[in-house]
Amino acid sequence: MLIDLKNIARRKQGKEIIKNISWRINEGEKWMLYGLNGAGKTTLLNILNAYEPNTSGELTLFGMQPGKIGYSADEVRNQIGFVSSSLMERFKDGEIVRDVVISGIFKSIGIFKEVEAHHVEMARHYLAQMGMSEFESQYYGYLSTGERQKVLIARALMGNPKLLILDEPASGLDFIAREDLLDALEQLYQRQPELSVIYVTHFVEEITKDIQKGFLLKDGTCYKQGEIKSVLDSDTLSDFFNRRVSVLHQNERYSLFLKR
């Protein structure tokens, strides 16, 4: 077990942003986290990343509990690879792609420590895994959004994380770029079956066959969680959206339609 949340809540300025959330993530599990804007996803991710405390409930992150002996927020973050659109914007256009990836070993924006030969080899290894070897010496600013996402995923893998959190990685990508990214992720999942993943999205079309579990977040609480087929179900999502929708599962992918 990597993550165990028991009835956690987070209150800000007198308002509960998330409440009564219980969620357990085991080694090797690939999860979808799905919720509309304002559902509390950002707050939940901040708690998982040890950037925000829970105000009630019991939280265990990689065997450690906040406030207990042995807990270290830095150690929690060392176990997590996190990729988000806000992270993408923090790197300068003039940085070399290889250096962006290497910075992941130091958990820094930019490199401020001595780079060793094995760091360079690691960066090349993960760039190759993401299909980005040819871009190693290029400027980060020359890359497309999809290419930058692959670079940031390679960067996240530099720390050998137990949990990879992908916060809307396909946001803003066209169809081809999205499918290229999802193909690269599928290959990653196959190569590292022990890696746990939380894939955050607004679109069921991004859910690939290796993501076998789903968590629906609505109004700050868990609406439903479990096996992906039971979560991405027409009746379940119709209730979730309070609109009549239909889910099509074909060729190991999902599509969502509004019934009219």
Language model region names:
Residues 139-143:
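Conserved ABC ATPase signature
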Residues 212-227:
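H-loop (His-switch) and adjacent beta-strand-loop-beta switch element
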Residues 117-135:
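Conserved ABC ATPase "signature" region
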